[in-house]
Amino acid sequence: ELRAELIRAGHVFRTDHSDTEVLLRIFQRLGFETCLSKLRGMFAFAVWDTHEETLYCARDRLGVKPFVYAQTDRGFLFSSEIQGLFALRTDLSRTPDYQAIDHYLTFQYIPAPMSGFKSIRKLPPAHALVVKKGRIERIFRYWNLDLTKRSGVSFGEASETLREMVIEATRLRLVSDVPLGAFLSGGVDSSITVAAIARLGASPLETFSIGFEDERFNELPFAREVAQHLGTEHHEMIVKPDAVSVMPRMIDHLGEPLADNSVMPTFYVSEFARSRLTVALTGDGGDESFAGYRRFYQIRRLEWLAERGLIPAWRGLRKLTVALED
């Protein structure tokens, strides 16, 4: 979309399909902050302006792509992984950030801008930063989700609008110069993603599922049923999780603690899919967006009780939440 817009404006591209060149062109044409408002999807980038001797960095709205950095006495370092920073500067301090660890024990992850190390920061989602002469000049939020609007549409209208938005979001992510596939667990999230891809006519579509010998955790039959219904080229593999052998690799990539029990299955299915392709769509984020976890229902029950004055401490808890967000 941006490429077509730039071509109509008279820009000539040196490549046929480079997202990087499109980003640079839109950056040159609109400037940093206006450029960010045009970008859709996941990204993390850094652009060096040779004329201004300024580095411009940004991370996508939801923080899908990682961006970590360190400000040192010798300049500014950035990477997509924490291990990348330690590779750049072997003497970079590895002192733990105990406040970040405290947050991890509370929230089961370390929220940005903190990391597990005092010397390293994470650029938060929907944020950008500007570096001049090796020093951070400013960090700012360029987008925020407006939760105050109420549309007033019916449930049916909202459902149809949501369906159209899912299809459109999927269509945008099918633009790729390499073959792509999809992870399929048989659950609602990944099944909707694969159904959207199939509806858009992306064929042949390869889907990937992993299963376990323990039937309590094996979802292969559900994934197989969805794959047959949608006519995908389906691949399955039974795995025997060995946390001891893969944990060092996972820790290297994560760079910090993360109490998410889906990390291990995701690691295995990613490794499985990588044997055939390099790009795959997933259903990640569905439960978070549409309150699919039991804890969201429990919070709604707490709100119901609080509205009736049955939880005296509720007002204090709400203030604590606001304080943490600030």
Map each language-model feature to its residues.
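Conserved catalytic micro-motifs used in adenylation/nucleotidyl-transfer and phosphoryl/amide-
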Residues: E1-E5, F32-A87, S115-R141, I192-V194
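ATP-dependent adenylate-handling active sites, centered on carboxylate activation for C-N bond formation
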Residues: E5-R8, A44, T50-F76, K133, ...
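Short, polar/flexible loop-turn hinges at active-site or ligand-entry regions and domain interfaces
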Residues: L6-T15, L30-C35, L88-T95, M114, ...
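Adenosyl-5′-phosphate
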Residues: R8, V12, F86-S93, K118-P125, ...
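Short, conserved phosphate-binding/catalytic loop or strand-edge motifs used
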Residues: D19-L24
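Active-site-adjacent loop/helix segments that line or gate small-molecule/cofactor pockets in enzymes
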Residues: R25, D97-P113
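Active-site loops of AMP-binding adenylate-forming
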Residues: F27-R29, T106-I110, M250-G255, R295
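Short, conserved clusters of charged catalytic residues that mark active-site
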Residues: L30-G31, K38-R40, A112-S115, T161, ...
